[in-house]
A protein has these predicted regions:
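Glycine-rich phosphate-binding "P-loop"
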Residues: 311, 413-414
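Conserved short-loop catalytic and cofactor-binding motifs
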Residues: 86, 102, 266, 270, ...
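Conserved short alpha-helical segments that host acidic/polar catalytic motifs at enzyme active sites
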Residues: 1-214, 218, 230-237, 241-261, ...
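Glycine-rich phosphate-binding loops that contact phosphosugars or nucleotide phosphates
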Residues: 258-407
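A structured phosphate/pyrophosphate-recognition subdomain
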Residues: 409, 430-432
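Helix-enriched interaction subdomains in cytosolic or periplasmic regions
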Residues: 208-241, 375-379, 383-413
Length: 432
């Protein structure tokens, strides 16, 4: 159904709630086939506040308001007490407190209720909200937690990650923090908390729609394992000129790599492990202090950073909350911040002094594969560049290093070609 057809439909004047515990297919099984809704919100929840129960699942509906939420509301208990919301709550979640708060503040104007609510809420959040007496409209606002949106002939879409709607439109924009988005069949509007209209800054993703599909593979992880050689090639090739590392296409000035006293690498999860490999690469060539810090702890310590310190932050999505907050802290101490991210225009990319985009394409499997290997390849290039600028290696040595890096995709292809052999070995070993 197109947007034009949506405009001709009678919009239901009620909020129909469907939620369950389990997989998305379990939710689909309880949804009505004859439902004539023209807009909806949904969320797959990883439990933070409260257990895995039907009552704790999103959306949460309180009075006139239905809401989904990605993030953590740090002062939810204080809000429940201040606004006397406890009697309205049936779940154990911080999210339901937000729904109850917005409902409490709602006096007919959805945007005004959201303005008042976000002024009270502390923490990270991305809200999508329905108001019963404003059918056919979705309202959204965020702080820190990611949110992207688009509008096209097939409809208006909003999500935490653009892979959710890339099959419909490659153009998208990142919803700015503390801006209220209104979405209808007629389009998307955006305004700041003072009510001033803001024009969305659209970007276009540069990978094909099939990159977000299994494309004949049994699952995404095996597909993404096989995509590693191409991903590494896409990442390193534009950054090699005359067999030397070159970041001119990234607009990274050569001076950025000069006069570096020490390096701190900040990341979470798999990206932190890539950082550990990067530490070895850089430290072995430069012989300067290199530390790796987990982002969730970095901002709670007094960082030993000065104006000659380089801070490298690593995040596949570019929206990892702890890493983003660590970057914001680092920016107060040094202008030498560099991010290694996979998503163009992401928050971490925008707030770094310089950004090194990896070209892994979307990584949908939970277990990281190609995103990790392109991060390691990026560190290899950086180590080589830093060593050259610090005069720790010669041009000839640098070319030897780069030649080795260029061979890595071929080595991976050779390993992957032996997959049938590895499969047989695994079957023999698994019950040994």
């Amino acid at each position: 159904m197109t947007v034009r057809e949506l405009r001709t439909l009678k919009i239901p004047e009620k909020i129909s709630l469907r939620k369950t515990v389990g997989k998305v297919k379990d939710l689909r099984a309880i949804c009505d086939d004859d439902n004539n809704s023209t807009c909806g919100i949904g969320h797959t929840r990883w439990a933070t506040h409260g257990g895995v129960t039907n009552a704790n699942a999103h959306p949460h509906k309180v009075g006139q308001v239905a809401l989904i939420h990605n993030g953590i509301i740090e002062n939810y208990h204080d809000l429940a007490t201040k606004y006397d919301l406890t009697d309205e709550l049936i779940s154990e979640t911080d999210t339901e407190v937000a729904a109850a708060l917005i409902n409490k503040l709602y006096e007919g104007d959805p945007k005004e209720a959201l303005r008042k609510a976000v002024a009270e809420i502390e923490g990270s959040f991305a809200f999508c909200v329905l108001f019963k007496d404003h059918p056919g409209e979705i309202y959204a606002v965020r702080n820190v937690s990611p949110m992207v949106a688009t509008y096209c002939d097939d409809g208006a879409f909003i999500a935490s990650d653009l892979t959710a709607f890339i099959a419909y439109n490659k153009r998208y924009f990142i919803v700015p923090e503390y801006h209220i988005l209104t979405m209808t069949a007629d389009g998307i509007t955006l305004e700041d908390l003072d009510g001033h209209s803001v024009e969305p800054e659209y970007m276009e993703v540069n990978w094909d729609v099939t990159a977000a599909q299994k494309d004949g593979y049994p699952h995404f992880m095996i597909k993404e394992i096989h995509e590693q050689p191409a991903a590494i090639t896409r990442t390193i090739t534009p950054r090699i000129k005359d067999m030397l590392p070159d970041f001119s296409e990234d607009a990274i000035a050569d001076s950025f790599f000069e006069n570096v006293s020490d390096i701190t690498i900040v990341a979470c999860g798999t990206a932190m492990y890539a950082g550990m490999v990067g530490k070895t690469m850089i430290q072995n060539r430069l012989h300067i202090p290199v530390t790796v810090a987990i982002a969730s702890e970095f901002r709670y310590e007094e960082p030993v950073i000065n104006e000659k310190s380089m801070v490298i932050v690593v995040s596949q999505s570019g929206e990892t909350i702890d890493t983003l907050e660590a970057l914001r802290l680092a920016n107060k101490y040094t202008k030498k911040t560099l991010s290694i991210v996979n998503v163009k225009g992401s928050s971490i990319a925008r707030e770094s002094s310089y950004v090194l985009y990896t070209h892994a394409g979307p990584e949908i499997a939970v277990a990281s594969t190609k995103a990790y290997t392109v991060q390691v390849a990026s560190f290899y290039l950086l180590a080589c560049k830093l060593a050259m600028k610090q005069q720790k290696i010669s041009v000839e040595e640098a070319r030897t290093f780069i030649g080795t890096l260029q061979e890595i995709p071929n080595y991976i292809e050779e390993v992957l070609a032996q997959a049938p052999t590895f499969e047989q070995l695994t079957k023999r070993m698994i019950n040994a």
